[in-house]
Amino acid sequence: MIYQEENQHLRIGLASPEEIRGWAERTLPNGEVVGRITEPYTLHYKTHKPEKDGLFCERIFGPIKSGICACGKYRSIENQREYSKICEQCGVEFTESRVRRYRMGYIELACPVTHVWYLKRLPSYIANLLAKPLKELESLVYCDLFLARPIAKKPTLLKLRGLFKYEDQSWKEIFPRFFSPRGFEAFQDREVATGGNAIEKGLASLNLQIVMDRAYMEWRNLTEQKSTGNEWEDRKIQRRKDLLVRRMELAKNFLQTNMKPEWMVLSLLPVLPPELRPMIELGEGELITSDLNELYRRVIYRNNTLLDFLARGRSTPGGLVVCQKRLVQEAVDALIDNGIRGQPMRDSHNRAYKSFSDLIEGKEGRFRENLLGKRVDYSGRSVIVAGPYLPLHECGLPKEMAVELFQAFVIRGLIGRYLAPNLRAAKSMIQDKEPIIWKILKEVIQGHPVLLNRAPTLHRLGIQAFEPILVEGRAIRLHPLVCAGFNADFDGDQMAVHIPLSLEAQVEARLLMFSHTNLLSPVTGNPVSVPSQDMLLGIYVSTIRSNRGIYQNQYHPYDYRNKNFSYKMFYFHSYDDILKAEKQKQINLHSPLWLRWQVDLHIVTSIDREVPIEIQYESLGTSSQIYENYQFRKNRKEKILSMYICTTAGRILFNQQIEEAIQGFFEVSQHRSRPLPAIIA
């Protein structure tokens, strides 16, 4: 937690070993430094009291009961004398028990351990920075392979280079004759590395600026290359370019945040406060505990065993030490993310342990359940339904919800107009739902934007601003086109409504967050508000035309007995004539018809050189050329006298709606009597 300008905010990132030690280590009033956990014990099996230097140690995490030490002595917390702050016998501070909710401990690992999130999660940050295959790094992390010359800049005695197996270490039988035990250990750490130690040395030796420059040079060379014509090779080159871009971004982020890549390898393991991984006593002395305690115990057991092996020196076989390092790595992996490598660790009942990742991820995790799901004032929640009649920037707010959200504004309006003498009378009028309330409410919400949010808010478009209008019912009405930004649909989804109170918040909502100003994706730049699902189906149904079109009045081979099968196509001169005929049931939405069109307008057709279906000549020399979607009437000099296009009433209505949205309703109503400049034919 970071405190800056009296505002608390949370920053998640890599922590250095010094930071981890600073979280946990404390100096007691008697000068003793506590914080390191060395014993894998929790509670004593008889007394059920925390074991010293264990996972519930009161010296490290604080007393279980406020003001009472481990040996049962009581001191007043308000007494600030120096000798009363700590028990001289057990070393427990006389303080409040709530400190056990935030005081941490740490485990000093006998060997560096790679953080499994940065190794196994995709993309693998460690593999990206080291430019090594993930399988090769996994074999190195879990001690299946050894790395010779881990620090390339230093001179070495061995001629080995790169990776090799444990069986290839013939030098281990020769070099001990020329070194003292300590000298041989120093030589071995310098020349050969495996496990997290090898990864740590490789990351520490990186120059991030050089990594960025080399990745950029290679990316530029690949970009300048022309296409090979081979689809497989082009895909391979594109994948390589994407990898280089990710490497440059990763190195840039490390440089900007002043974090070091070697911090992705743990040498100190933080231990959560005991109140966050409790052990509870049930009846008859039975205990239930968090899975994290069992996983921490396994780490400490294996770490202490490795410490014993290393303390014995050369008397311990090298293969045993290597095997124990792998066990420590696997124990830490299970603690952080159990099952990420395949088969998870299980208890005696064959139940997989819940790791740290299981506790924080998902809908019921620590972040979404406890930190992000808080209720706030001036907010509400309801189901969303479609409101296709609404403009893009408006939403339908139920009256029952609006009067609660804007209650403070309504009360101010009632008292300001002397309709209510005091606060109590104004609230009584609102509860009785007097008619004057709705009038004032309409005035209050006019020009006052509201914020709609749909959880989870994964990107900027997850919360947008709208102008509210009052609607009946209890559901929030929303235009279907804005659902894509929220990733919402009308199958029972809920949305939260928030009221921006300050003038600054309202201005920000109006200028930056209105839905009609967020039509493009901030990530890709592609349109977000596009028709989909029932909108596309409705547009298709309203603009569909009979399959036979102008051929309906020709002989039909399947209905030769039906003499009334021939269909007469009507001719119209304006939009209004078509709409009147449709209302009078003379035509339907899908009936083909001829609409008079302006001669000087160009007709777009899918056929470049279309041949007329029929040509009719009249006695005065005029002629009519009939095509599939339009027809001309010409004089003797081939001058076009009139033109008609084949369309439907449904397409006329659809085109009219588009024009009203673009030009405005009043402008369209003034020019509706004459043919409009565009139509779907």
Curated annotation (Swiss-Prot):
It catalyses: RNA(n) + a ribonucleoside 5'-triphosphate = RNA(n+1) + diphosphate. Gene3D superfamilies: 1.10.40.90, 2.40.40.20, RNA polymerase II, clamp domain, RNA polymerase Rpb1, domain 3. Its EC number is 2.7.7.6. It comes from the Eukaryota. It is found in: Plastid, Chloroplast. Mg(2+) binds at D489, D491, D493. SUPFAM superfamilies: beta and beta-prime subunits of DNA dependent RNA-polymerase. Its cofactor is Mg(2+); Zn(2+). Zn(2+) binds at C69, C71, C87, C90. GO terms for cellular component: chloroplast; DNA-directed RNA polymerase complex; mitochondrion. It is an enzyme of class 2 (transferase). GO terms for biological process: DNA-templated transcription. The keyword Acetylation does not apply. GO terms for molecular function: DNA binding; DNA-directed RNA polymerase activity; magnesium ion binding; zinc ion binding. Keywords: Chloroplast, DNA-directed RNA polymerase, Magnesium, Metal-binding, Nucleotidyltransferase, Plastid, Transcription, Transferase, Zinc. Transmembrane segments: none annotated. Signal peptide: none annotated. It holds the Pfam family RNA_pol_Rpb1_2. Binds 1 Mg(2+) ion per subunit. Binds 1 Zn(2+) ion per subunit. In plastids the minimal PEP RNA polymerase catalytic core is composed of four subunits: alpha, beta, beta', and beta''. When a (nuclear-encoded) sigma factor is associated with the core the holoenzyme is formed, which can initiate transcription. Belongs to the RNA polymerase beta' chain family. RpoC1 subfamily. DNA-dependent RNA polymerase catalyzes the transcription of DNA into RNA using the four ribonucleoside triphosphates as substrates. PANTHER family: DNA-DIRECTED RNA POLYMERASE, DNA-DIRECTED RNA POLYMERASE SUBUNIT BETA. This is DNA-directed RNA polymerase subunit beta'.
